[in-house]
Amino acid sequence: PLLVKGELDAAAVPANLAATLYNKTNGAVEVACINTLGVLYIVENGETVNSVGDLKGQTIVTTGKGATPEYVLRYVLTENGVDPDSDVTIEYCSEATEALSKVQAGEATIAMLPQPFVTSAMSQVEGLRVALDMNEEWQKVTGSKLVTGVLVVRKDAVENDPEAFAAFMDGYAASVEAANNDL
């Protein structure tokens, strides 16, 4: 990646990738801030899922095998007494549109999707509803918010020009503030 090669100073990445980058670079790439909290939801075309336990015996279509969505789903299931390997079937799709297509075609009734895709999906599939907010489910079992995205920086870039980094972070914070309050 360009960040590791030193061609970029910062990047917004999934939280699990940040951990990998930190480890692979021996701390040369580190997290500067969290930029995305819980964006994952279990949606259902039906009314059977009202708790994590209700997923037992069900098929869940989702994306993110080997990434944050898989880890979140498996952890929340396990902590609620649902074995992700034997109590449910998890079918991984390459992207959210593929998962939605399966729900639209009636091949699946339950999917785990990220926002803003959930909102779009609900307008496309009559009867589709948010059954579980995975951020809430994560918080119930961990006591912390679900971090899904972060801003990472090259440590040497920050150390070489701390004023530029501080100015960047001020601008970044102002951008977040504007997005949250002015739209």
List where the protein language model places each region.
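Short, glycine-/small- and polar/acidic-enriched structural segments
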Residues: 1-93, 107-115, 122, 127-134, ...
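Pocket-lining segment of extracytoplasmic ligand-binding domains
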Residues: 15-17, 91, 97-183
